[in-house]
Amino acid sequence: MKLTCVLIITVLFLTASQLITADYSRDQRQYRAVRLGDEMRNFKGARDCGGQGKGCYTQPCCPGLRCRGGGTGGGVCQP
C-alpha cells in the first residue's frame, strides 16, 4: 500500500514537472526563432550584392546578373 502511494505521488510529480518544463521551453523556442530570423535579415552577406560592373570576387552578384570573367582579379557582374 505504501509503495503504491509512493509510486502514484512520484508519477504525479514527474508529470507536473514535465508539463512545467514543456511550457517554458515552448516559449523559449518561439523567441529563439524570432531572434534567428532577425539575424538572418541583418546578415551582411544577405544584404550586399554587386551591381552591374562591380566585382564579384568578395560578394555575389545581384539578381539578374552573373559573374563573368575571372583571372587573377576576380570576375565582374554582368547581365
Curated annotation (Swiss-Prot):
Tissue: Expressed by the venom duct.
Classification via InterPro entries: Conotoxin (IPR004214)
GO cellular component terms attached to this protein's record: extracellular region
Residue ranges listed under propeptide: 23-47
Pfam families, A to Z: Conotoxin
Coarse class of the protein's main subcellular location: secreted
GO molecular function, one term: ion channel inhibitor activity
Top-level lineage group: Eukaryota
Protein name: Conotoxin 12
